[in-house]
């Protein structure tokens, strides 16, 4: 699907404030929309998740097609009951930081959910064609939605609002199909196309190339600004692009082995990189390039999903076997396990 057809399918490529659904003349979502105020709550329980105690995070379970909370605190936690009826949604994602979740139903409708209360509201006029991926900014107040391989994306801002009508949506074009994307707390979006090499493109403002990587190993923004971390899997390197016109900083390490994902601490001082070449992650001190540490895991990392804490990230997802996480900010960085979830 090309960029223009993508934009028409999703929403007009301009900011729209839901409620009025103000689209530019000549633009159309191509769908009959449902007002958020008429939404049906399909969460499995009206009880507040917060009443179950502290949460270490929220994670989408692809095998069950539902969202689950991680109850407890890092190091002493377990998966809670499904937050939405399993099978009603085909894709989803959540921000532990903001307590916001986004879900895609079988018709491609995107809904906004408060992970704390379970309140679920469809976003009027926001549809996708295909199983979407949801990437949140560090604060969790912005998100970018894209379907891998399609040439376009949606930028959602104002996710901290309790009313879905206050969420703003902007359609973004990409000249090539996206395989990944990242969004900053300031609303800047960078998309990645291709694998070896991979091209990074700024999708907001004056769209332009950002960088070319020998191999794509992940991108993420640091909290609070537009500084971007980009991992080159072919050269086992991490590039920090300040976002202010200054020259990028390159981090290399013998511990980096075919990296495929990167995450940043909430204080912006630490990067965590997941290796594809062995069962480990690497902690990089962004203030001192010499301060590096390889953290082995008995698991095979397949993600870096932010959980509660400064630098706590899930390494594997919910399933019938033990899930794993890493606390990279601890005095002695270490991995943590989350017991296998119990089918509900």
Stretch-by-stretch model annotation:
Residues 23-26:
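C-terminal motif of bacterial Sec signal peptides marking the signal peptidase cleavage site
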Residues 60-63, 95-96, 102-106, 137-138, ...:
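Conserved beta-strand positions in repeat-built beta-propeller and related beta-rich domains
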Residues 77-84, 119-126, 164-172, 206-212, ...:
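A short beta-strand motif characteristic of beta-propeller blades
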Residues 73-75, 114-118, 158-162, 202-206, ...:
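Short loop/turn segments that connect beta-strands within beta-propeller blades
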Residues 46-47, 87-98, 127-140, 173-184, ...:
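Repeated scaffold domains used in trafficking and secretory/extracellular systems
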């Amino acid at each position: 699907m090309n960029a223009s057809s993508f934009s028409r399918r999703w929403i007009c490529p301009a900011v729209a404030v839901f409620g009025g659904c103000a689209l530019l003349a000549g633009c159309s979502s191509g769908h009959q929309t449902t007002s958020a105020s008429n939404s049906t709550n399909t969460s499995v329980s009206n009880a507040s998740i917060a009443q179950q105690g502290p949460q270490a995070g929220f994670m989408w379970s692809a095998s069950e097609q539902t969202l689950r909370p991680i109850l407890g605190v890092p190091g002493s936690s377990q998966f809670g009951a499904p937050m939405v009826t399993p099978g009603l949604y085909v894709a989803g994602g959540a921000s532990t930081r903001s307590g916001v979740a986004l879900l895609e139903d079988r018709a491609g409708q995107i809904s906004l959910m408060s992970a704390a209360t379970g309140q679920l509201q469809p976003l009027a006029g926001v549809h996708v064609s295909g199983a979407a991926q949801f990437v949140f900014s560090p604060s969790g107040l912005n998100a970018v939605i894209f379907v891998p391989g399609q040439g376009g994306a949606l930028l959602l801002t104002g996710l901290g609002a309790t009313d879905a009508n206050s969420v703003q949506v902007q359609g973004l074009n990409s000249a090539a199909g996206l395989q990944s994307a990242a969004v900053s707390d300031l609303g800047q979006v960078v998309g990645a196309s291709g694998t070896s090499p991979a091209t990074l493109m700024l999708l907001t403002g004056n769209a332009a190339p950002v960088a070319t990587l020998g191999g794509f190993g992940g991108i993420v923004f640091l909290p609070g600004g537009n500084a971007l971390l980009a991992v080159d899997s072919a050269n086992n390197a991490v590039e920090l692009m300040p976002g202010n016109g200054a020259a990028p900083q390159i981090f290399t390490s013998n511990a980096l082995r075919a990296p495929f994902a990167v995450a940043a601490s909430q204080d912006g001082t630490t990067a965590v990189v997941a290796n594809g070449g062995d069962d480990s992650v690497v902690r990089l001190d962004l203030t001192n390039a010499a301060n590096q540490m390889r953290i082995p895991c008995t698991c095979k990392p397949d993600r870096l999903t932010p959980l509660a804490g400064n630098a706590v990230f899930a390494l594997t997802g919910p399933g019938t076997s033990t899930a794993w996480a890493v606390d990279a900010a601890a005095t002695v960085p270490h991995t943590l396990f989350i017991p296998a979830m119990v089918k509900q």
